[in-house]
Amino acid sequence: MIPQIQRNVIRQRVHTRIRERIQGTTERPRLNVYRSLNHIYAQIIDDTQGRTLVSASTIADKIKTGGNVAAAKEIGKLVAQRAVDKGIKKVVYDRGGYLYHGRIKALADAAREAGLEF
């Protein structure tokens, strides 16, 4: 079994490799996801200007439990609704070095259902 500290270092290395290839632009900003044990965070970032355009998390919103798949679906819908309201329809999905499974996949599927294309 890999200790949690080493697992996080491995994830950060994978995320660095992903970020070398993925770049958010003004036309297609980057949908970044961060997952902790108790919460999930999503933000849409324009890397050319270095600005966060839209964000949503289980801390800022009134979702009682933040560390489960249902909360990830809610955050996916919420960030997609906020993005569509600002005129953003196409994004690049940045899974943040996490496996595309569980909460990360649920957030992506909910964002797609709510109108984002990636």
Swiss-Prot record:
GO terms for cellular component: cytosolic large ribosomal subunit. GO terms for biological process: translation. Keywords: Ribonucleoprotein, Ribosomal protein, RNA-binding, rRNA-binding. CDD domains: Ribosomal_L18_L5e. One of its GO terms (molecular function) is structural constituent of ribosome. InterPro entries: Ribosomal_uL18_bac-type (IPR004389), Ribosomal_uL18_bac/euk (IPR005484). PANTHER family: 39S RIBOSOMAL PROTEIN L18, MITOCHONDRIAL, LARGE RIBOSOMAL SUBUNIT PROTEIN UL18M. Part of the 50S ribosomal subunit; part of the 5S rRNA/L5/L18/L25 subcomplex. Contacts the 5S and 23S rRNAs. This is one of the proteins that bind and probably mediate the attachment of the 5S RNA into the large ribosomal subunit, where it forms part of the central protuberance. Belongs to the universal ribosomal protein uL18 family. This is Large ribosomal subunit protein uL18. The gene is rplR.
